[in-house]
């Protein structure tokens, strides 16, 4: 059962509507981090008590006997100033200095131990199909953080951090592609983000299913050691009658995520500093056109998505 809560912090009120009585105090703090930028360990939620003592992180919200729309005061400060929060973390070379995967592809993509891990995911990972795959449609796999959503900046609602033209992009893509969301977080937060952005409830398109970090595998690379990647083989193994290397494309801002299937990956420019770039970012407009162009093809393997803008410019100039 949903448990709406209003949290007051920094002179503003934040509405929390995606949690239930089965979620914990820590879940609430994690969600508040996405809204305010205050780390869970820095948060002090006044008034949350059990038997007269402050509620621990593992206490379920239902045990607090809160009435719907209860107002809670939060104390705590962000680690950085707002400008710092708007910037990517300084040690996050996933985005800034994402390594060139081309040198390591051959060693990783076909290594037997990695293929065995993919096979294990195909057998063991449970996919909840939200809408059935459609015959004859191609497959678009989308990352979330920095691809569809600026997850580092602070805002009152997720909509303020949504990448411009997201719904128009998904509406157009849905005409030719089944859409899958794959984020390197847990499913609870993927579902919360999709609800907050209005993706899971939009009437103009449907999400076929969503994958979380449990569908990923760890591979060893000579230069970077162990890294987590998103192997599309998990999807192809589970839905072989619909999807394959020939009809699948994946957008991600981190190139290493398609180390197991480099030819199917398109490295999108990360959407950061939403407050500054919301009016300038046109990435999804151009990618809408690219997806429409390549949807005419029978085999995506003849494409090099690294040069997608060049391909689009050439096609539009004909």
From Swiss-Prot:
Keyword Glycoprotein in record: no
Required co-factors: Mg(2+)
Gene Ontology MF terms in the entry: metal ion binding; proteasome regulatory particle binding; protein serine/threonine phosphatase activity
Residues with PTM N6-acetyllysine: 117
Keywords noted in UniProt: Acetylation, Hydrolase, Magnesium, Metal-binding, Nucleus, Protein phosphatase
Predominant cellular place of this UniProt entry's protein: nucleus
Domain of life (superkingdom): Eukaryota
E.C. number: 3.1.3.16
UniProt record, GO biological process: regulation of proteasome assembly
Claim: Kinase is one of the keywords in the record: no
Binding site for Mg(2+): 143, 145, 253
Domain Ubiquitin-like: 3-81
Cellular compartments annotated: Nucleus
Modified residues (N-acetylalanine): 2
NCBIfam families xref list: HAD_IIID1 (TIGR02245)
Domain topic, free-text comment: The Ubiquitin-like domain mediates interaction with proteasomes.
Protein's UniProt name: Ubiquitin-like domain-containing CTD phosphatase 1
